[in-house]
Amino acid sequence: MKKLLDMAEQLSERYLISEVMELPEQAEDQVYYQLLKMAGKSMLEQIGEVERERLEYKEYIEQWIHEIKTPITAMKLLCENHRTDWTKELLLELEKTNRFTEQALYYARSEHTEKDYSVREMALSQVVHQAIADNKYLLLQSGMRLEVEEMQGTVYSDEKWVRFILNQLIANAVKYRTEQPVLRISTHKRQDQVVLVVEDNGIGIAASDLPRIFEKGFTGQNGRLIQQSTGIGLYLCKRLCEKLGIGITAESSEHGTAISLSFHINCLIHEVQS
Protein backbone atom coordinates (compact mmCIF):
# COMPACT_ATOMS: atom_id res chain seq x y z
CA MET A 1 0.00 0.00 0.00
CA LYS A 2 2.83 2.40 0.85
CA LYS A 3 4.43 1.73 -2.52
CA LEU A 4 1.12 2.53 -4.22
CA LEU A 5 0.75 5.79 -2.28
CA ASP A 6 4.31 6.79 -3.17
CA MET A 7 3.59 6.16 -6.85
CA ALA A 8 0.44 8.28 -6.66
CA GLU A 9 2.37 11.15 -5.04
CA GLN A 10 4.77 11.21 -7.98
CA LEU A 11 2.02 11.52 -10.58
CA SER A 12 0.81 14.95 -11.66
CA GLU A 13 -2.45 13.36 -12.91
CA ARG A 14 -3.25 10.92 -10.11
CA TYR A 15 -6.29 9.52 -11.88
CA LEU A 16 -3.74 7.67 -14.05
CA ILE A 17 -2.53 5.58 -11.11
CA SER A 18 -4.04 2.40 -12.59
CA GLU A 19 -1.84 2.82 -15.68
CA VAL A 20 1.34 2.37 -13.65
CA MET A 21 0.06 -0.27 -11.23
CA GLU A 22 0.92 -3.92 -11.56
CA LEU A 23 -1.93 -6.42 -11.72
CA PRO A 24 -2.48 -7.69 -8.14
CA GLU A 25 -2.19 -11.40 -7.47
CA GLN A 26 -5.18 -11.75 -5.14
CA ALA A 27 -8.65 -11.92 -6.71
CA GLU A 28 -10.16 -9.35 -4.32
CA ASP A 29 -7.40 -6.86 -5.13
CA GLN A 30 -7.93 -7.45 -8.84
CA VAL A 31 -11.54 -6.26 -8.45
CA TYR A 32 -10.34 -2.96 -6.98
CA TYR A 33 -7.72 -2.75 -9.73
CA GLN A 34 -10.39 -3.12 -12.43
CA LEU A 35 -12.55 -0.49 -10.70
CA LEU A 36 -9.59 1.90 -10.74
CA LYS A 37 -9.05 1.17 -14.44
CA MET A 38 -12.72 1.91 -15.17
CA ALA A 39 -12.63 5.13 -13.16
CA GLY A 40 -9.44 6.25 -14.88
CA LYS A 41 -10.87 5.52 -18.32
CA SER A 42 -14.05 7.44 -17.51
CA MET A 43 -12.00 10.40 -16.29
CA LEU A 44 -9.87 10.42 -19.46
CA GLU A 45 -13.00 10.34 -21.62
CA GLN A 46 -14.52 13.28 -19.75
CA ILE A 47 -11.28 15.26 -19.92
CA GLY A 48 -11.10 14.57 -23.65
CA GLU A 49 -14.67 15.78 -24.11
CA VAL A 50 -14.04 18.97 -22.14
CA GLU A 51 -10.88 19.61 -24.16
CA ARG A 52 -12.76 19.13 -27.44
CA GLU A 53 -15.51 21.52 -26.33
CA ARG A 54 -12.92 24.08 -25.23
CA LEU A 55 -11.11 23.81 -28.56
CA GLU A 56 -14.36 24.17 -30.52
CA TYR A 57 -15.28 27.27 -28.51
CA LYS A 58 -11.81 28.75 -29.05
CA GLU A 59 -12.05 28.13 -32.80
CA TYR A 60 -15.52 29.71 -32.84
CA ILE A 61 -14.26 32.81 -31.02
CA GLU A 62 -11.31 33.16 -33.42
CA GLN A 63 -13.58 32.76 -36.44
CA TRP A 64 -16.11 35.25 -35.05
CA ILE A 65 -13.37 37.82 -34.44
CA HIS A 66 -12.05 37.44 -37.99
CA GLU A 67 -15.59 37.86 -39.35
CA ILE A 68 -16.38 40.94 -37.25
CA LYS A 69 -13.16 42.67 -38.32
CA THR A 70 -14.43 42.82 -41.92
CA PRO A 71 -17.37 45.18 -41.22
CA ILE A 72 -15.20 47.17 -38.80
CA THR A 73 -12.67 47.77 -41.59
CA ALA A 74 -15.45 48.61 -44.05
CA MET A 75 -17.03 51.15 -41.69
CA LYS A 76 -13.62 52.70 -41.04
CA LEU A 77 -13.02 53.17 -44.78
CA LEU A 78 -16.46 54.73 -45.23
CA CYS A 79 -15.83 57.17 -42.40
CA GLU A 80 -12.37 58.10 -43.68
CA ASN A 81 -13.83 58.86 -47.12
CA HIS A 82 -16.64 61.01 -45.68
CA ARG A 83 -15.03 63.15 -43.00
CA THR A 84 -17.39 65.03 -40.69
CA ASP A 85 -17.36 65.73 -36.96
CA TRP A 86 -19.69 62.78 -36.53
CA THR A 87 -17.51 60.35 -38.49
CA LYS A 88 -14.44 61.46 -36.53
CA GLU A 89 -16.17 60.34 -33.34
CA LEU A 90 -17.21 57.10 -35.02
CA LEU A 91 -13.63 56.45 -36.18
CA LEU A 92 -12.46 56.72 -32.58
CA GLU A 93 -15.06 54.19 -31.43
CA LEU A 94 -14.20 51.84 -34.30
CA GLU A 95 -10.55 52.04 -33.32
CA LYS A 96 -11.48 51.05 -29.76
CA THR A 97 -13.68 48.22 -31.02
CA ASN A 98 -10.87 46.90 -33.19
CA ARG A 99 -8.48 47.00 -30.23
CA PHE A 100 -10.91 45.05 -28.04
CA THR A 101 -11.43 42.41 -30.73
CA GLU A 102 -7.66 42.07 -31.13
CA GLN A 103 -7.35 41.64 -27.38
CA ALA A 104 -9.99 38.90 -27.42
CA LEU A 105 -8.22 37.17 -30.32
CA TYR A 106 -4.82 37.16 -28.65
CA TYR A 107 -6.36 36.04 -25.37
CA ALA A 108 -7.95 33.07 -27.16
CA ARG A 109 -4.62 32.22 -28.81
CA SER A 110 -2.36 32.86 -25.83
CA GLU A 111 -2.51 29.26 -24.59
CA HIS A 112 -1.12 27.79 -27.82
CA THR A 113 0.91 30.68 -29.21
CA GLU A 114 3.56 28.42 -30.75
CA LYS A 115 1.14 27.70 -33.62
CA ASP A 116 0.70 31.38 -34.46
CA TYR A 117 4.02 33.20 -34.23
CA SER A 118 6.56 33.80 -36.98
CA VAL A 119 9.96 34.96 -35.76
CA ARG A 120 11.95 36.94 -38.28
CA GLU A 121 14.14 40.01 -38.51
CA MET A 122 12.16 43.19 -38.00
CA ALA A 123 12.88 46.90 -37.71
CA LEU A 124 11.66 48.35 -34.43
CA SER A 125 11.03 51.70 -36.11
CA GLN A 126 8.55 50.09 -38.49
CA VAL A 127 6.52 48.26 -35.87
CA VAL A 128 6.46 51.34 -33.60
CA HIS A 129 5.06 53.54 -36.38
CA GLN A 130 2.51 50.85 -37.29
CA ALA A 131 1.29 50.80 -33.68
CA ILE A 132 1.05 54.59 -33.66
CA ALA A 133 -1.00 54.45 -36.87
CA ASP A 134 -3.28 51.83 -35.29
CA ASN A 135 -4.09 54.32 -32.52
CA LYS A 136 -3.99 57.61 -34.43
CA TYR A 137 -7.56 58.67 -33.63
CA LEU A 138 -7.20 57.73 -29.98
CA LEU A 139 -3.97 59.73 -29.74
CA LEU A 140 -5.48 62.74 -31.52
CA GLN A 141 -8.62 62.74 -29.39
CA SER A 142 -6.61 62.53 -26.17
CA GLY A 143 -4.30 65.40 -27.13
CA MET A 144 -1.29 63.17 -26.57
CA ARG A 145 2.04 64.63 -27.65
CA LEU A 146 4.31 62.02 -29.21
CA GLU A 147 8.06 62.00 -28.81
CA VAL A 148 9.53 59.16 -30.86
CA GLU A 149 13.29 58.90 -30.89
CA GLU A 150 15.24 57.24 -33.68
CA MET A 151 14.92 53.48 -33.28
CA GLN A 152 18.18 51.53 -33.04
CA GLY A 153 18.66 48.63 -35.44
CA THR A 154 16.66 45.46 -35.94
CA VAL A 155 15.73 42.51 -33.74
CA TYR A 156 14.33 39.02 -34.27
CA SER A 157 10.74 38.62 -33.11
CA ASP A 158 7.15 38.33 -34.32
CA GLU A 159 6.14 41.71 -35.73
CA LYS A 160 2.40 41.09 -35.32
CA TRP A 161 2.72 40.16 -31.66
CA VAL A 162 5.05 43.05 -30.82
CA ARG A 163 2.64 45.41 -32.56
CA PHE A 164 -0.21 44.08 -30.42
CA ILE A 165 1.88 44.57 -27.26
CA LEU A 166 2.67 48.17 -28.24
CA ASN A 167 -1.01 48.82 -28.94
CA GLN A 168 -1.84 47.77 -25.38
CA LEU A 169 0.87 50.01 -23.93
CA ILE A 170 -0.23 53.01 -26.00
CA ALA A 171 -3.87 52.49 -24.98
CA ASN A 172 -2.85 52.34 -21.32
CA ALA A 173 -0.87 55.58 -21.66
CA VAL A 174 -3.97 57.28 -23.02
CA LYS A 175 -6.27 55.73 -20.43
CA TYR A 176 -4.19 56.90 -17.46
CA ARG A 177 -3.13 60.27 -18.87
CA THR A 178 -3.02 63.61 -17.09
CA GLU A 179 -3.36 67.11 -18.51
CA GLN A 180 -0.83 67.89 -21.26
CA PRO A 181 -0.09 64.19 -21.82
CA VAL A 182 3.19 63.08 -23.37
CA LEU A 183 4.14 59.67 -24.75
CA ARG A 184 7.83 58.95 -25.36
CA ILE A 185 9.07 55.92 -27.27
CA SER A 186 12.79 55.27 -27.41
CA THR A 187 15.40 52.54 -27.64
CA HIS A 188 18.85 51.94 -26.21
CA LYS A 189 21.33 49.10 -26.26
CA ARG A 190 22.26 47.18 -23.12
CA GLN A 191 24.90 44.47 -23.48
CA ASP A 192 23.37 41.90 -25.86
CA GLN A 193 19.93 43.50 -25.82
CA VAL A 194 17.97 46.25 -27.52
CA VAL A 195 15.56 47.82 -25.04
CA LEU A 196 12.39 49.52 -26.31
CA VAL A 197 10.92 51.93 -23.75
CA VAL A 198 7.33 53.24 -23.80
CA GLU A 199 7.07 56.04 -21.26
CA ASP A 200 4.26 58.42 -20.32
CA ASN A 201 3.72 61.26 -17.87
CA GLY A 202 0.41 59.91 -16.60
CA ILE A 203 -0.94 59.29 -13.11
CA GLY A 204 1.47 56.41 -12.52
CA ILE A 205 1.06 53.18 -10.60
CA ALA A 206 1.04 52.91 -6.81
CA ALA A 207 4.24 51.34 -5.45
CA SER A 208 2.19 48.66 -3.67
CA ASP A 209 0.49 47.72 -6.97
CA LEU A 210 3.59 47.64 -9.17
CA PRO A 211 4.63 44.01 -8.41
CA ARG A 212 1.16 42.76 -9.45
CA ILE A 213 0.40 44.72 -12.63
CA PHE A 214 1.03 41.71 -14.89
CA GLU A 215 -1.38 39.47 -12.98
CA LYS A 216 -4.56 38.46 -14.77
CA GLY A 217 -7.49 40.68 -13.77
CA PHE A 218 -5.44 42.98 -11.51
CA THR A 219 -6.47 46.63 -11.88
CA GLY A 220 -4.91 48.30 -8.84
CA GLN A 221 -5.85 51.53 -7.10
CA ASN A 222 -5.93 53.70 -10.22
CA GLY A 223 -7.57 51.01 -12.31
CA ARG A 224 -10.53 50.82 -9.95
CA LEU A 225 -11.15 54.53 -10.57
CA ILE A 226 -11.49 53.92 -14.32
CA GLN A 227 -14.41 51.71 -15.36
CA GLN A 228 -12.68 50.61 -18.58
CA SER A 229 -9.89 48.83 -16.68
CA THR A 230 -10.04 45.04 -17.00
CA GLY A 231 -6.59 43.88 -15.91
CA ILE A 232 -6.21 41.87 -19.13
CA GLY A 233 -4.00 44.10 -21.31
CA LEU A 234 -0.76 43.94 -19.32
CA TYR A 235 -1.40 40.29 -18.44
CA LEU A 236 -1.49 39.46 -22.15
CA CYS A 237 1.61 41.57 -22.79
CA LYS A 238 3.51 39.62 -20.15
CA ARG A 239 2.27 36.27 -21.42
CA LEU A 240 3.17 36.98 -25.04
CA CYS A 241 6.56 38.39 -24.05
CA GLU A 242 7.33 35.19 -22.16
CA LYS A 243 6.44 33.12 -25.23
CA LEU A 244 8.70 35.25 -27.44
CA GLY A 245 11.60 35.51 -25.01
CA ILE A 246 11.14 39.27 -24.61
CA GLY A 247 11.83 40.75 -21.19
CA ILE A 248 9.17 43.14 -19.90
CA THR A 249 9.55 45.36 -16.84
CA ALA A 250 7.75 48.39 -15.43
CA GLU A 251 8.86 51.43 -13.48
CA SER A 252 6.45 54.03 -12.18
CA SER A 253 6.04 57.07 -9.97
CA GLU A 254 3.50 59.84 -9.55
CA HIS A 255 5.09 61.44 -12.63
CA GLY A 256 4.37 58.57 -15.02
CA THR A 257 5.10 55.01 -16.05
CA ALA A 258 7.80 53.42 -18.21
CA ILE A 259 7.44 49.93 -19.68
CA SER A 260 10.62 48.38 -21.09
CA LEU A 261 10.72 45.57 -23.65
CA SER A 262 14.12 43.85 -23.87
CA PHE A 263 14.96 42.03 -27.11
CA HIS A 264 17.95 39.70 -27.16
CA ILE A 265 20.05 40.46 -30.21
CA ASN A 266 21.81 37.12 -30.65
CA CYS A 267 19.88 34.43 -28.77
CA LEU A 268 16.22 35.31 -29.22
CA ILE A 269 15.47 32.63 -31.81
CA HIS A 270 17.01 29.94 -29.62
CA GLU A 271 14.94 31.08 -26.63
CA VAL A 272 11.68 31.06 -28.60
CA GLN A 273 12.30 27.62 -30.09
CA SER A 274 13.26 26.13 -26.73
Specify the residue positions occupied by each region the protein language model found.
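Short conserved segments within the C-terminal catalytic ATPase subdomain
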Residues: 136-148
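Short beta-strand/loop element within the Bergerat-fold HATPase_c
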Residues: 180-192
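Short conserved segment of the HATPase_c
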Residues: 205-218
